[in-house]
A protein has these predicted regions:
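Contiguous hydrophobic segments
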Residues: 1, 11-12, 134-139
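Gram-negative bacterial Sec-dependent N-terminal signal peptides
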Residues: 2-21
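Metal-centered catalytic cores of metalloenzymes
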Residues: 21-139
Length: 139
C-alpha cells in the first residue's frame, strides 16, 4: 500500500512537470492577487510557515492546491501541493495541477498528519523554483 502511495505521488510530480508548459506563471512578488488568498488570513496558521513560507491559495483548488509559497522578502520560491493520503489510496488522481513557475530546481515530498485547512493526513509535495529557495523558506 505504501509503495502505491509513493508511486502515486511520483506520478503527481511527473504530471506537474509535464503540465508546466500549459500553465501561466504566478507573480514573482507577493501578493499574487485574485483569486488567491493568503492562507494565514483564512486559517489559524502563522503568516510564515518555516519550510513552506508565506502561502497563498485559490480556495477553488483545495485541498491539493497549488499553494504559492513566498519567502520573507515576498519572492516566489515554491509551489506546494497537499494531497490527502486517503484520497490517493482510493484512486483519486490530481491531474493537470498548475505550477507557479516554469523552473523547478528541486522537489521535497513528506508526510503531514494534518493541520487547519487540510485536516486529514496528507503528503506535502514542494517544487522549489530556484537553487536557494529551500534555504530561504527554512527560517
Amino acid at each position: 500500500m505504501e509503495r502505491t502511495l509513493f508511486a502515486a505521488t511520483a506520478l503527481l510530480i511527473a504530471t506537474a512537470a509535464v503540465s508546466t508548459a500549459q500553465e501561466a506563471n504566478a507573480p514573482e512578488q507577493a501578493p499574487p492577487g485574485d483569486p488567491f488568498v493568503q492562507v494565514s488570513d483564512a486559517l489559524p496558521l502563522p503568516e510564515f510557515i518555516p519550510g513552506l513560507g508565506t502561502l497563498f491559495v485559490d480556495p477553488a483548488t483545495l485541498p491539493a492546491g497549488p499553494f504559492l509559497a513566498y519567502d520573507h522578502d515576498g519572492k516566489l520560491s515554491a509551489t506546494v501541493y497537499m494531497t490527502p493520503l486517503e484520497e490517493l489510496q482510493n484512486g483519486t488522481a490530481y491531474d493537470d495541477l498548475a505550477t507557479a513557475s516554469d523552473t523547478v530546481t528541486g522537489v521535497d515530498i513528506y508526510y503531514n498528519a494534518g493541520h487547519p485547512g487540510v485536516d486529514k493526513p496528507h503528503a506535502h509535495v514542494v517544487l522549489f523554483h530556484d537553487p536557494d529557495a529551500k534555504a530561504r523558506l527554512a527560517k
